[in-house]
Amino acid sequence: MTNILRTLLLATSLAAIPLTATKADAANDTKTTAAKVFEVKNPDFTKSPYSGMTRQHWIEAGEYLLDGAFGHIFSLDDPMYFPKQLEKTYPGNPENSKVAKLEGLARTMFIAGPLLKNNPDLTLHGIKVADYYRHQLMAITNPKSKHFIAKRTGGPSQTLLELASLCISMKAAPEVLWEPLPQEEKDKLAATILSYGEGPTIGSNWMFFNCFALSFFKDQGYKVDEKKLVDWLQKLLDRYKGEGWYNDAPAYDYYSMWAYQSYGPFWVEFFGKHFKPSAESGLPENIYQEISQKFLKNEADLVDNYPYMFARDGRMNMWGRSITYRFAAVTPLPLVEYGNFENVNYGWLRHIASSTLLQFLQHPDFLENGVPTMGFYGPFAPCIQIYSCRGSVYWTGKAFLGLLLPEDSKYWSATENEGPWADQLKPGNVYNKIQPATGLLITNYPNCGGSEMRSWCHETVEKDWQKFRSGENYNKLAYNTEFPWMADGKKGEISQNYGTLNKKGEWEVLRLYDFKDFNNEIYHREAVLETDKNVRYQLNDILLPDGILRVDKVSVPDSTEITLGHYTLPEGSTEFKATLDPGKSFSNRQISLPAMKGEKHGRSVTCYTNGQYELAMIPLYGWTVQEKAIYPDGLHPVSHRCVLPRLSQKVGGSQILVTLQLWKKGANDTGFTARELQPVKSVQVSKDQKTVTITLQSGKKKVVTFE
């Protein structure tokens, strides 16, 4: 599969056909674009007491995003091609941009389809949106057009994804985007798209695109290879593992949600429910309904799991590849209604969706030249993959598929609420939701309102030629909604992970994790170093109301320097920095703590704050050094500088390390108390170094055993 993917991406980046340039082809010319930050006008705090957002506001948000894209369009023939951002993205040469332009077209159409269904006469920057997309659809099969796409002649390609995505949007608003096309144009478009849809694919979420191409044209009366269609649908279902999660060959990430759990229910609602196999296919009469039931059963599983990944206020976590797709993560939430399940809290789901949307639309760094940036908030190269172009960001547009639900639907008519955060997740406690089928762990922290994910990662840098499955998108010990991840530096600047100075003299982080078990609320993993399998970490996470208690054992064949990083804090507000000495971005303070039971001496703890949060990292056992913070530049997705509390020392043989990583919200007002910095009463380690008994101040005991 690796060779296929390599061929695919090289083809995407290099094999496009040089095009005749127009003004918009240059990608840098723009008209006056939308306001920098989206404004919720006339918010409805009766129906939506947290976000103020109603279905109408979602329509306005879609128009706001699409307006920015149309700021680059001067005529019906101009492509959806946007200014390149970050060198690692494609295309490398502006002349080789055909696939990037198709990607911009298909993905902005995710937004346009639902908007046009609501308002077929939508006009942006003096251009009728429906006319533009119909013109572009017909240009695909016009050999005289610079947008012409030839029928497939090779293997899997990005072209398959984008052409099939057009089918999703055409189905969303067929009366505007498909039905007005002349029959001859429909036939030509069917022939081109089916040449890709019935061709080879990759055994991941890509198979959905083949399914949508075949399903759309089957629905329009065209003959398609239904045996292939059913085979791909079955293979997609085979990727399901449990608790709402699909394995995307090989990762668990947001693709489970913005692909499998969005495309599956959409396919059921618009195709599977009413499909009948053709007589010549020889397929069972109810095969499509049987497949539909399986997709919906899997969708039902996510309802009691996935929403817990979001913060109390509805913000999403920075985790996994393609994170620049951002609020596409909420796409499956409204589509839950297609399953007609009982006891669904639609008000909570909509609160999450609207809050995540505003998390980005109201961030000042989200747009540049009217187009979403290549990053999480602003541009941030470490979280971007080489398969992305600037138009890729409009994958976010799938979130607007929820507009296909009517105003009086359960989803849009429910009153926003906080779900279990309101009365079930109580302050002073921590709540873990293990996902047994995958080993993922979701943790909720009512004290701060944050949520945390412990992730899948088992990929070597050597085999990860695209350099994202082995990287920070997956390899952190944990991901928290309150602390977007910092990229690793070359000098040991490593957050929320262990780093080991390997035999090459390079800092190497853990990435080859194996999940072992989750017993007595202890999350147990093991990991080895990629460059030296004799370097072994036994990892145990004990989650506390205000942070993480790590009970780990590192084993090394030779004396080796290691480091363990906490989460990081970006620079605080201008108002906060105004309270500091000139040139400072953070403040810190020392707190003296008494000795724990069984200790002779107490300890001094340094707490760091940016005005919004305070962090503390406290060595309890095995460390011979005190925590010391560093202030990396250019590694954080939110600000240029951040603060990273960390511990670093040399270890030899086997060493047990017990560490507290704590945080407190609203630290500018109060900060940690000495009591809050002492959740652990005692740490007892057996003489054979195989058992650690932790006694918490609450009286609870946690016992960790090592080999």
What are these regions (language model features)?
Residues 98-104, 109-119, 126-337:
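Aromatic-lined, polymer-binding surfaces characteristic
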Residues 10, 91-96, 148-153, 427, ...:
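Short alpha-helical segments and helix-capping/turn motifs at coil-helix boundaries
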Residues 83-93, 377-380, 420-425, 533:
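Short linear interaction motifs
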Residues 1-30:
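Bacterial Sec-dependent N-terminal signal peptides
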Residues 478, 491-707:
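Extended repeat-based interaction scaffolds and adjacent low-complexity, acidic/S/T/P-biased segments
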Residues 144-149, 189, 283, 311-318, ...:
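Carbohydrate-active enzyme catalytic cores, enriched for enzymes
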Residues 28-103, 131-136:
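Low-complexity, Ser/Thr/Pro/Gly-enriched N-terminal "stalk/linker" regions
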Residues 358, 386-406, 410-576, 583:
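Catalytic and substrate-binding regions of extracellular carbohydrate-active enzymes
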